[in-house]
């Protein structure tokens, strides 16, 4: 019976297959056609729909009538005739729910649209029922993750604006045409993830202000797949009493529930994943990943016994799918460790093997701690090391070499019992013998006759010892006359002889030695006298095999053959073949053509002539020369050489005395003439103004073609900005200008002809045009002033600080790390090479400016780094040799930070960088010629005057009229100032007056010879301005001090910190605290105690910087020991007294910066406004105004390189000495115990304790150091302190009134108010500055002798 059923089943399968093939091969008729040609038609509700279908076979219809009871209204009638099948569908009184697809198809064939069926989509329009209702109240839409979903809310009216809504939660999903797509025939099509969270969705439309909703659709996300099931650990070992923890984890689809079942070895039964007994506990956990679920069940068995040993099985079931995972457990009675009994084992390997394994047979629980030793030296594994631990114990050595041989010892220690076991393995590395000289020696050794050379063979075979023996062969026994070049030729020379001292013509001595340390065998063969040619062979042998080296020993006298004019002459040249020999050894030189040897390249150097077939040459022009001296020369000229002259030539010489003939061979090869040809044609280029472009014209030809470039039929010559390289093959145009546009032609010519290629260069963008007509006048002025400039330069250098004090650098700041870590900040910052990259070949390094632990800063000259100049002095920061990758990344991060900060006048700005491979990383910043502010102030101590000195000159009528001209602005200033940001040079010019350079030099010569109070306030104001900019860029400096402020030309100060250029271990300003060195004198209390760096801690440092400025570079806290007591007193409220040259307003500003609470300190914006008012007042007393730059002005002028700001160095015209008038100028003294809020405070100053052993170092007084001589004199001169500038001035100009108004309404005031502010103005109160005011004024004399103490009445909160 079973056999019959099987046969019937097989027969049925065969019939089905044949029928299917018959259907495939059967003729398919033409598709049916409808009387309606449109794909979509529209009718109104209650209308009658009639569709006629014609075809070649029996027809049937499919309709959406199942949504309604349309049996009585839907009829299908046969209309066949004329040989075609015909069927008519009639639907009367159509309703909206019958909207859909009406398809006509062949009854006996599968439905294929356009082949066996045809359809039309009918909209039955009913504006009262715009949505096609489903039969039930709701429908379920099943979705799967990652698939498209169709929400089938069909409409009866095609052109409706339909919106999809989710109900839980309520949300509108608008149609965007990309993810959410509306199709009036299908509904909404969208990804499943868009509605996977929604419980219910529905469609909605509005018709004539009436809203209609479709039936609701329930969204059901289904899933059942279990991707994987893991049980960890798979192999567990424990001792009695320990705890077993097994974690069964399944990764599934979303919305999948898992039932976990556990099977134990000793119970042989399954328990569910939620059971809990005294020893067995399970816990479940669920974790949703981004596209799956992670379901886990953890089994915990307390106090395992020996009976718990066995297999544990975890079964996970989702209903439709099930997976099983298992793990094994071995329970031991107690910890142990056991190694194999063999104490010494030998492991052999071969050099060059991929790996060598030293396997350790052991059995232990728990896993022991393993240490490996090689020759009693501990092996430390590293990632890049070739040794690895396999499974934590076995040692694997990759890429075996001879150096790996040795004794390896493994030491295993039980982590619980501390029991220790060790075994030693000897690794022997065998290798085939290798003769080292074969790697570097030539095929032949040529020695002078009578010399005593030594032949050496050095061989090694790894751990296998090597023996070396020598053999020799006379040249008569080698049938190959030419010197051997390959092993195939050497195979013919097999008559080797053993060595003996009395055989052959070359007496010799043999010696062999072994180097025990390197396992190398060295054998030498000493030739006592080189007499005749011979072959020598050394053979190295060990148990792995052998190696040999053949030395072709050639004895020669002076012979040489050369070809002129070059070793590779060209067809058509006049060639000379020259043979040179020692005339004391050779004579009768003759040239021959060799006939029996062809195409031997290269030929041997010298062979016996009797082995060659020589043909005589007609030599009428052969000349013998050089008979004087020891050499004789035979020249054979070949005029106008042709290809027929190619071949092997021999110069025959005869040896004096023996008449033996030796031939020197040379294979003459000529290079055929070839017409010039351009290999790659030029292509048109479009470049931007100031970019560089390169045209490459690769040519070939013999002789080498000459290349000429032309532009618009004019020859291109190399010059400024135009570079020709590689014999004119490469044309480079630097800093392209508009006039560089044109047609460039490369023409290559030689004797055979010429060829050219052309390309058109188009230049886009506008360029900065320089008035060429001004070049000649400016050049004449510069030349005429050269001597005067040289004098000024010498004077400046005399008063410049030492080179050791020049610490020029860049900004070493940090980003505010509240948002993310510093490393992540730097990773996110980008470097735009197209904007900042500067070629290294246009950078000329000069003298070093600073040097630190791992970096250095050098002065350099950059060519073309700025548009307006061709040569700029810059500072370049670079790493020292041997810098690590982390130091490279640190410098690269600081480069990115500088780019992120941007440009500002009072910050050392970035100019470019060199980051490309092929050279060191270099960061290019501005160069500040006057060095750091601290050193500069110290150098100017003897040249300080609180007031401005003026050189009187007679004003002319035109100048007076210009000064009074009201058209020159509200400020009444007839000068305009331009400040070049990059070069730091400023110029004040009047229309029709002096030129840029003249005014600049006059200005510097008159104003830079001494310091004034206005200078000090200006420095402070500019630093505050720069810090305000840094604060706006969320940057914290952390080391704001005078040493990190650089002074450029025209009194422009720039904030910097050459971190790598300063070695903090050698700087006395940095005090060791733990493992770090910190500038404690400049640090705020919260930074010292809590390591908190904020912008307000920079404000504290700014206050200390003010103290440095107004003490002319003195070290803060003079005479105070910087230790824990200093930090404690600082926290208790003790502050420094006013410096010698500070006004009350300035000192009060310092105290405000030193307030205990960071939030009570002024911001840099407030400090800018306050110091700007003080600077304005000081400038007005000097007869002019100083207008601080605003942020808007700064940003605008950073685009254009000239800043429209009134320079603090302006000219004063008068017929008498400069007179300064003061209104209500109070005497300089301490503030009247007022803080920034006007609240009286009691502050303690640091008490100076003079000690016996004092040392003064550059004005710096540290622990155990007393006051300097200047400071002692200052105490006696305090009473003679000069009057101060008052910030509340009564000025007669309206700009002065504006300044006063600004001063009164400032958002931040110093807290000082003069008691004489309302006193009457004394017109006769004035001070005339004398010419001899260059000497330092007397320091103020204080009555309190530094004993006055001020303390806070209550500590700040």
UniProtKB/Swiss-Prot annotation:
Residues 1-22 form the signal peptide. Its main location: membrane. InterPro entries: Ig-like_dom (IPR007110), Ig-like_dom_sf (IPR036179), Ig-like_fold (IPR013783), Ig_I-set (IPR013098), Ig_sub (IPR003599), Ig_sub2 (IPR003598), Kinase-like_dom_sf (IPR011009), Prot_kinase_dom (IPR000719). It is an enzyme of class 2 (transferase). It is found in: Cell membrane; Cytoplasm; Nucleus; Cytoplasmic vesicle. ATP binds at residues 849-857, 877. Residues 1298-1312 have a biased composition (Polar residues). Pfam families: I-set (PF07679), Ig_3 (PF13927), PK_Tyr_Ser-Thr (PF07714), VEGFR-1-like_Ig-like (PF21339), VEGFR-2_TMD (PF17988), VEGFR1-3_N_Ig-like (PF22854). It is a single-pass type I membrane protein. Interacts with isoform VEGF165 of vegfaa and, to a lesser extent, with isoform VEGF171 of vegfab. Interacts (via juxtamembrane region) with chaperone pdcl3 (via thioredoxin fold region); the interaction leads to increased vegfr2 abundance through inhibition of its ubiquitination and degradation. This is Vascular endothelial growth factor receptor 2. It comes from Danio rerio.
């Amino acid at each position: 019976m079973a056999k019959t059923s099987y046969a019937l089943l097989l027969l049925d399968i065969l019939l089905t297959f044949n029928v299917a093939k018959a259907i495939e091969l059967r003729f398919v008729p033409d598709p049916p056609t409808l009387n309606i040609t449109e794909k979509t038609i529209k009718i109104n509700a209650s209308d009658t729909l009639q569709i006629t279908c014609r075809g070649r076979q029996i027809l049937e219809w499919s309709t959406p009538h199942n949504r309604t009871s349309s049996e009585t209204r839907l009829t299908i009638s046969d209309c066949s005739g004329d040989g075609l099948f015909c069927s008519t569908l009639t639907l009367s009184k159509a309703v909206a729910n019958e909207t859909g697809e009406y398809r006509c198809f062949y009854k006996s064939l599968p439905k294929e649209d356009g082949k066996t069926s045809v359809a039309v989509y009918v909209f039955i329009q009913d504006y009262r029922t715009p949505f096609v209702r489903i039969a039930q109240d709701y429908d379920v839409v099943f979705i799967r993750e990652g698939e498209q979903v169709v929400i089938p809310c069909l409409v009866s009216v095609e052109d409706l604006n339909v919106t999809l809504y989710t109900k839980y939660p309520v949300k509108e999903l608008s149609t965007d045409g990309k993810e959410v797509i509306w199709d009036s025939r299908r509904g909404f099509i969208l990804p499943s993830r868009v509605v996977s969270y929604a419980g219910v969705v529905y469609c909605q439309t509005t018709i004539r202000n009436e809203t209609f909703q479709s039936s609701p659709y329930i969204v059901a996300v289904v899933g059942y797949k279990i991707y994987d099931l893991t049980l960890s650990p798979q192999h567990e070992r424990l001792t009695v009493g320990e705890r077993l923890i097994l974690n069964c984890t399944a990764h599934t689809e979303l919305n999948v529930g898992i039932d976990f079942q556990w099977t134990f070895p000793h119970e042989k039964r399954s328990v569910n994943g939620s059971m809990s007994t005294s020893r067995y506990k399970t816990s479940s956990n669920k974790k949703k990943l981004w596209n799956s679920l992670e379901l886990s069940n953890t089994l915990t068995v307390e106090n395992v016994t020996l009976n718990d040993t066995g297999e544990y099985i975890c079964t996970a079931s989702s209903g439709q799918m099930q997976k099983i995972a298992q793990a094994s457990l071995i329970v031991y009675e107690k910890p142990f460790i056991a190694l194999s009994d063999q104490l010494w084992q030998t492991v052999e390997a071969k050099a060059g093997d991929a790996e060598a394994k030293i396997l350790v047979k052991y059995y232990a629980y728990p896993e022991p701690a393993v240490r490996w030793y090689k020759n009693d030296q501990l092996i430390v594994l590293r990632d890049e090391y070739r040794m690895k631990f396999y499974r934590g114990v076995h040692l694997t050595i990759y890429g075996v070499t001879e150096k790996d041989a040795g004794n390896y010892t493994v030491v295993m220690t039980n982590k619980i019992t501390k029991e220790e076991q060790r075994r030693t393995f000897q690794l022997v590395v065998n290798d085939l013998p290798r003769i080292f000289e074969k790697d570097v020696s030539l095929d032949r050794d040529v020695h002078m006759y009578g010399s005593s050379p030594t032949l050496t063979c050095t061989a090694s075979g790894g751990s296998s010892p090597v023996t070396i023996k020598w053999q020799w062969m006379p040249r008569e026994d080698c049938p190959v006359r030419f010197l051997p070049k390959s092993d195939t030729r050497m195979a013919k020379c097999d008559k080797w002889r053993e060595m003996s001292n009395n055989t052959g013509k070359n007496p010799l001595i043999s010696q062999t030695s072994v180097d025990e340390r390197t396992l190398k065998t060295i054998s030498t063969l000493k030739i006592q006298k080189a007499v005749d040619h011979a072959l020598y062979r050394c053979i190295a042998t060990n148990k792995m095999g052998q190696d040999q080296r053949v030395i072709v020993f050639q004895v020669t006298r002076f012979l040489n053959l050369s070809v002129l004019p070059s070793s590779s002459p060209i067809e058509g040249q006049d060639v000379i073949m020259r043979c040179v020999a020692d005339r004391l050894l050779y004579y009768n030189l003759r040239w021959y053509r060799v006939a029996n040897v062809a195409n031997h390249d290269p030929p041997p150097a010298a062979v016996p002539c009797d082995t060659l077939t020589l043909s005589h040459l007609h030599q009428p022009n052969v000349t013998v020369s050089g008979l004087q001296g020891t050499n004789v020369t035979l020249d054979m000229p070949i005029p106008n050489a042709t290809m027929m002259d190619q071949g092997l030539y021999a110069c025959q010489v005869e040896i004096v005395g023996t008449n033996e003939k030796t031939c020197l061979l040379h294979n003459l090869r000529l290079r055929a003439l070839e017409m010039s040809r351009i290999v790659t044609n030029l292509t048109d280029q479009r470049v931007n103004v100031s970019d560089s472009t390169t045209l490459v014209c690769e040519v070939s030809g013999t002789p080498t073609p000459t290349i000429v470039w032309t532009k618009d039929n004019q020859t291109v010559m190399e010059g400024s900005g135009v570079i020709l390289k590689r014999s004119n093959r490469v044309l480079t145009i630097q800093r392209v200008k508009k006039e560089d546009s044109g047609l460039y032609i490369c023409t290559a010519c030689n004797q055979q002809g010429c060829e050219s290629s052309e390309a058109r260069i188009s230049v886009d963008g506008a360029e900065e045009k320089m008035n060429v007509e001004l070049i000649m006048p400016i050049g004449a002025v510069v030349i005429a002033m050269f001597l005067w400039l040289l004098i000024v330069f010498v004077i400046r250098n005399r008063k410049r600080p030492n080179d050791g004090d020049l610490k020029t650098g860049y900004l070493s700041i940090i980003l505010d790390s509240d948002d993310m870590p510093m490393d992540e900040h730097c990773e996110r910052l980008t470097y735009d090479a197209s904007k900042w990259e500067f070629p290294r070949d246009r950078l000329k390094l000069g003298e070093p400016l600073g040097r630190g632990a791992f970096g250095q800063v050098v002065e350099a000259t950059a060519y073309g780094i700025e548009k307006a100049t061709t040569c700029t002095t810059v500072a370049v920061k670079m790493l020292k040799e041997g810098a690590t990758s982390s130091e490279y990344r640190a410098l690269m991060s600081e480069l990115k930070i500088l780019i992120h900060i941007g440009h500002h006048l009072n910050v050392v700005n970035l100019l470019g960088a060199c980051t490309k491979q092929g050279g060191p990383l270099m960061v290019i910043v501005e160069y500040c010629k006057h060095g750091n502010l601290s050193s500069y102030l110290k150098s100017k101590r003897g040249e300080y005057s609180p007031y401005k000195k003026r050189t009187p000159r007679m004003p002319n009528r035109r100048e007076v009229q210009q000064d009074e001209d009201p058209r020159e602005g509200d400020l009444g200033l007839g000068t305009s100032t331009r400040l070049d940001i990059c070069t730091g040079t400023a110029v004040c010019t009047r229309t029709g007056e002096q030129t840029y350079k003249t005014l600049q030099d006059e200005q510097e010569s008159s104003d830079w010879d001494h310091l004034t109070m206005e200078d000090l306030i200006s420095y402070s104001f500019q630093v505050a301005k720069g810090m305000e900019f840094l604060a706006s860029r969320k940057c914290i400096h952390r080391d704001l001090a005078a040493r990190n402020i650089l002074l450029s030309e025209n009194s422009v100060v720039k904030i910097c910190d050459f971190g790598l250029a300063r070695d903090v271990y050698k700087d006395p300003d940095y005090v060791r605290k733990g493992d770090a060195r910190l500038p404690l004198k400049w640090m705020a209390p919260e930074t010292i105690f809590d390591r908190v760096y904020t912008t307000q801690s920079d404000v504290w440092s700014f206050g200390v910087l003010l103290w440095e400025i107004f003490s002319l570079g003195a070290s803060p806290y003079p005479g105070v020991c910087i230790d824990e007591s200093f930090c404690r007193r600082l926290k208790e409220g003790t502050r420094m007294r006013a410096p010698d040259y500070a006004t009350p307003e300035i000192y009060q500003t310092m105290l405000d910066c030193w307030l205990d609470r960071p939030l009570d300190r002024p911001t840099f914006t407030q400090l800018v406004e306050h110091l700007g008012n003080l600077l304005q007042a000081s400038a007005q007393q000097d007869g002019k105004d100083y207008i601080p730059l605003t942020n808007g002005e700064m940003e605008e002028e950073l685009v254009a390189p000239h800043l429209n700001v009134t320079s603090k160095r302006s000219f004063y015209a008068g017929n008498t000495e400069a007179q300064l008038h003061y209104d209500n100028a109070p005497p300089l003294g301490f503030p009247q115990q007022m803080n920034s809020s006007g609240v009286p405070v009691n502050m303690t100053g640091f008490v100076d304790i003079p000690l016996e052993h004092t040392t003064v170092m550059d004005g710096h007084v540290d622990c155990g150091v007393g006051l300097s001589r200047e400071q002692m004199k200052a105490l006696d001169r305090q009473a003679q302190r000069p009057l101060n500038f008052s910030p509340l001035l009564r000025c007669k100009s309206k700009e002065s009134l504006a300044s006063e108004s600004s001063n009164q309404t400032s958002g931040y005031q110093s807290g000082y108010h003069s008691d004489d502010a309302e006193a009457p103005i004394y017109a006769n109160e004035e001070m005339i500055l004398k010419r001899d005011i260059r000497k330092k004024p007397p320091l103020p004399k204080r009555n309190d002798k530094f004993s006055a103490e001020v303390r806070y009445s209550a500590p700040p909160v």
